[in-house]
Design a protein with these regions (language model features):
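Structural preference for solvent-exposed beta-strand-turn elements
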Residues: 1-328
Length: 328
């Protein structure tokens, strides 16, 4: 089977992007640790996010779905029984290709009193895990991974809060430590090497955890019970970036993106488009689950070459490919 794709001369219209993947992971995990049933509308249908649901189900969490993925009315219900309530699985848990699932669940499972093995596909088994192992072992868990790569064996334990200075700018490392901090005694703090996505901190607050943020230092008080919530996942800004960039580049284009996440740690690509000369309008329409959302409108203009600095790269990690296409 083959398809011919023709470059349009212009694009125009209104789109609603699929649910954000990063936020979907975090809402599902925290719902599994809350005491009660949470409803998560517009949960991402991406394979990685489905890996998170499969992982939680293997740990005894009850999850059900209503409607069809990526269609209006789609939602999942996740029933949790509080911190420390996950059950030992029957065997190793395969997280597929999802590094987010493995690293964040390592933090969650470090505070549970059983052994679990997290594995994945060939690609995931080549990714580094030592950056997550180090802080979790400082908190009291025991983790083993040959040469720092999966499979990852986690032996949960009673955890203590730590002050962790992260050597890398990584939202996943920060998230793993904060999720472990939920189960620790005292306060756990993470000092960021550079600003990263803050979806975990926002979600923790939405579920009722005690979270603080001062000058690049994020803290969480252990033992705070989480309450269930009903929430909608905003549209994925990284998916929106492709059509936004196309609208900026193709003459006479005008695209509106509704219901999209407008978290400031995810909208740097809009600043790049503006600097290049595109007409970009952003309207924040509300906040749900700690996440701002709204509308983006992009209209084409004559674009100019620009430079992207090294400091900007961490906040553009998903959008760099399409911005590179724009530069071409």
């Amino acid at each position: 089977m083959s398809q011919t794709i023709r470059r349009p001369s212009r694009i125009e219209g209104v789109i609603v992007p699929p649910g954000d993947k990063s936020i979907s992971h975090r809402y599902a995990m925290l719902a599994a640790l809350a005491n009660g049933t949470s409803t998560i509308a517009d949960y991402s249908s991406g394979i990685d996010c489905q890996s998170t649901l499969s992982c939680l189900e293997a740990l005894g969490v009850i999850i059900s779905a209503t409607g069809e993925p990526d269609r209006p009315g789609y939602s999942i219900s996740v029933t949790g029984h509080g911190l420390g309530s996950l059950h030992a699985p029957d065997g190793p848990i395969n997280t597929g290709n999802s590094g987010t699932t493995m690293r964040l669940m390592a933090g969650v499972l470090s505070g549970h009193p059983f052994e679990v093995v997290l594995t994945g596909d060939h690609s995931l088994r080549r990714r580094p895990m030592q950056r997550v192992i180090n802080p979790l072992e400082q908190m009291g868990a025991r983790l083993d991974a040959e040469d720092g790569h999966p499979p990852l064996t986690i032996r949960g334990n009673k955890l203590i809060g730590i002050d962790y200075v992260s050597p890398v700018a990584s939202a996943q490392v920060k998230s793993a430590v904060l999720l472990a901090g939920l189960h620790a005694t005292g306060i756990t703090r993470v000092h960021e090497a550079a600003p990263t996505r803050d979806h975990t901190e926002r979600a923790l607050s939405a579920f009722g955890a005690e979270v603080s943020h001062t000058d690049g230092v994020f803290g969480i008080t252990g033992g705070s019970p989480l309450h269930p919530i009903d929430v909608a996942v905003p549209g994925d800004p990284s998916s929106a970036a492709f059509l936004a960039t196309a609208a900026a580049a193709l003459p006479d284009s005008d695209v509106t993106i509704d219901g999209v996440g407008l978290n400031p740690t995810r909208t740097a690509y809009l600043d790049i488009l503006r600097r290049a000369g595109a007409d970009v309008e952003v309207s924040v329409e509300g906040v749900g689950g700690g996440e701002p959302y709204g509308t983006i409108r992009v209209r084409s203009r004559t674009l100019a070459h620009i430079a992207i600095t090294a400091v900007e790269v961490p906040s553009l990690i998903d959008e760099l490919p399409v911005l590179g296409a724009l530069a071409a």
